[in-house]
Amino acid sequence: MSRGALIVFEGLDKSGKTTQCMNIMESIPANTIKYLNFPQRSTVTGKMIDDYLTRKKTYNDHIVNLLFCANRWEFASFIQEQLEQGITLIVDRYAFSGVAYAAAKGASMTLSKSYESGLPKPDLVIFLESGSKEINRNVGEEIYEDVTFQQKVLQEYKKMIEEGDIHWQIISSEFEEDVKKELIKNIVIEAIHTVTGPVGQLWM
């Protein structure tokens, strides 16, 4: 039995990640695919993250970084098991978000990546570009919904994309929604059909 593919959607806040994930979920047989999003706010770490994001509690940046990382590690075994059972996972945010947001706040990218080292490695990361309209919508109640901060996050994403050690697909914000939907669906289907070998380890 061939394994499932680990496909991650990344991008700035309000870039359309969840919408595109749901489009994929509707396009592929339900018995072969599952959706997972981070942070998972139902766990102990997730509830602490939710309190932080919604400004109910404050933590120093190092603690916040570790909380987000721990939240992903809580699901590392689940991800590995699902992939080995032939289930493809569509993941809304992953380690790259954690590293980009931490680095945008001044943390060492190298150190932040070391916390995530060993997580299941994605077979494909789809990065949704944000147009000026989407970026300017980044004003909201949660702590990271700030235009200036989101621009910093974007620069950190670009650094990771340029490293070339991960298979990234950048989706332009210039595409019409129906074109974007079809393009992403085709990219995902190809990734599922061409995945080979054991699940890799991220940043090892």
From Swiss-Prot:
Reaction equations catalysed: dTMP + ATP = dTDP + ADP
Keyword hit for Nucleotide-binding: yes
Highest taxon of the lineage: Viruses
Induction pattern: Expressed in the early phase of the viral replicative cycle.
Annotated Gene3D superfamilies: P-loop containing nucleotide triphosphate hydrolases (3.40.50.300)
Keyword DNA-binding tagged: no
Example of a GO biological process term: dTTP biosynthetic process
Family: Belongs to the thymidylate kinase family.
Primary role: Poxvirus TMP kinase is able to phosphorylate dTMP, dUMP and also dGMP from any purine and pyrimidine nucleoside triphosphate. The large substrate specificity is explained by the presence of a canal connecting the edge of the dimer interface to the TMP base binding pocket, canal not found in the human homolog.
Record protein name field: Thymidylate kinase
Organism annotation: Vaccinia virus (strain Copenhagen)
Organismal lineage: Viruses, Varidnaviria, Bamfordvirae, Nucleocytoviricota, Pokkesviricetes
Gene responsible for this protein: OPG178
